[in-house]
Every structure is written in structure tokens, then in C-alpha cells.
Amino acid sequence: MRQSRRASSRVNRLVVIFIIVASGFLLLYKNTQQFTQIDRECIQDEWQENNNLGNTIDDGSNFRIAFTDIQQNYTWLHLPNFLENSEILMIVSSNCDNFARRNILRKTWMNPENSQIIGDGRMKALFLVGINGADEKLNAVVLEEAKVFGDMIVIDLEDNYLNLSYKTISLLLYSISKTKSPNLIGKIDEDVLFYPDQLTPLINDKTINTSTFSIYGEKYEAGVAVNHGEDNAKWQISKNSFKCSVYPSYLSGPTYFLTRKAAKRIVEATKHRKFISVDVEDVFITGLLAGDVGIKKNQLPFMYMIEEATNDRESYEILAWHTKKRDQQYIEAFESLKLNRCKSCRKSKNPDLEELKEK
């Protein structure tokens, strides 16, 4: 009886081992099949020469963004005074009506008292804001805010999801045409909890190498499926805009960093692709355009671009966390996590932040 049980136990172990090994091979097979040579050729085939089409360009007070199938002209409504002494430029993509969140960011990570890299002048932080075409009073308030704080770029682009790719290209164009000193450019959304001082060791140890053609952030490997409308989801891409079934590798959109060299190449590459007018600007810019011009895509540590990827109670370091925290929660999380999840942060408390928390 015991021998029978032992034999049965051995068989069960062998079955478990077989299942584990088979699952491993199946997973490996799936991963190797996600992005094939056919997929790569499809993406390359979408690229168009367009030698007769003008580039995306800054004309001084106006600028032009050119894609293969559509070209748009915009105006710089307000430009901040930029002192050429910062090597890093962070630009927050901000909705025009989010006055409260901009003030929260000014009091938290954008404040020199909270970020030594900003206090030392090594980093400059600005907002990029569009307009609301149906609300002239709101636009007037935005322009007044820009004059008062001096940290806003305002353009006459309608602030909505369909224009995200235009807005990000505008961000990159400003960075390479209106400034000279920054050799690292960061694009960040206003709902990201960010600790700028965490960049210092990453730059110092060459994890981020500003002399290369590179982008850095949370990387998704090639093979993510394209939604061509099969499941009636909110965000779909027509096959006329992009016919391929999967995307190349790309960086998650809420926060990523580009060397100046990479940003320049990406801006120059826009005219070679059709405009994709849905909320996949990260794929479009860091995946397709960056891939077209040979930009290296790099994974950075301490990046959490999915809300569930981390929480307030874990012990991992944080550089950037895309979180849904409301204004008061954002302030509290920034202050508490600064103490235990940001080794590079200054330890001094900010009296302005304490006052804001009390309100």
C-alpha cells in the first residue's frame, strides 16, 4: 500500500514538473511570436519618404507640425523667459483648466525647497498648456496665470485627447528650438508623483547618458496588439492610419525622458508618418517615430506608470509614479514618500507645503 502511494506521489510530481516545463516552453513560444519579421516589415512599410513635404518647424511666434497626411499651424501664445543654465528641462503636459493641480505641483516637486536639482539650477520645470476654444474667459485666466508665474508655455492648440500627439510634438519642438542648454528633456503628466532628485545618481552613473540618441522610461516590449475596432473599445486606430496588427517597443506616456539629440531626430521624423489621432501618443512618439530614426529605448528603474504597480506602503524607491490621487492625497503622499522612498531627496521640510496641507 505504501509502495503504491509512493509511486502515485512520484507520478504526481512528474506531472507537475511536466506542466511547469510545458508552460515555460509555451510562454517562451508566445513571447517569440509576439513580434515577427512580418510585423517589423509592416511597420517599416508605413514609413513614407515625403521629400517634398516641409518639416515640423518653429517660425518664431508660430510653428508648424507636419505629418504625412495632415499639417497644422499653431501659435506660441505665451513663452516664459528661459535662462540658459539648466541641463535638464522637465515639461508638464497640463490641461488648461487644471489651475489647482498646477499650484500643487509648484508647491511639491517643482519647488526648489523640495528638489535640490531644481534649487541648484540643474533642472528647469515648466508647464505646457493649450486652450479651450469655447471659453475665452478661461483662456484669458490661463494667460494671466502664465504671466504671473512665468513657468508656462501656452499654445493655441485645443486641449483634448485627440490632440495629445500634437501637444507632445509641440513640447519637443519648444525644447529644441526655444532653449539651448538642456541636454535632457522630460515629458511628464500632471498626475504623476515625481522626485526629480532621483535623476541625479542615474545621470552621474551614466544610466542616463545624455550624449547618446536615447529615450528612457518604463519600457513595453514589441508585440502589444493594435485595437482596430474589433472590441468596440473607446480608443481605436483605423487601418488607414496604421494598418499593422502590433506595435513596436515603446515607453509609457505619463513620464519619459529624451536626450536632446533624440528629441531633435523625432521632431524631424514626423513628416514620414500619418497622424494617429487617439490616446496612443506614447506609442506613436516613443515607439514608431523613435524607432524610425534609430533611437535607443531604455528601461529606467523606479518607474511605476500603472497605478497598481506600487502603493504608499511598499519600500521600493520611487522616481515617478502615475497615480490617481486627488490634490490633497497627492500632497500627503509626496511628503510621506519623500522621507522613505527617495534616497536622493533633501530632508528639509518646506513651510509652504506644510501651510498648503493645513488648508
UniProtKB/Swiss-Prot annotation:
Carbohydrate-modified residues: N73, N163, N209
Recorded metabolic or biological pathway in which this protein acts: Protein modification; protein glycosylation
Subcellular location: Golgi apparatus membrane
Pfam families: Galactosyl_T
Keyword Transmembrane carried by entry: yes
Cytoplasmic-side segments: 1-11
Ranges of the Lumenal topological domain: 30-359
Gene3D superfamilies found in the cross-reference section: 3.90.550.50
Principal localisation: Golgi
InterPro entries: Glyco_trans_31
Entry similarity comment: Belongs to the glycosyltransferase 31 family.
Protein name according to UniProt: Beta-1,3-galactosyltransferase bre-2
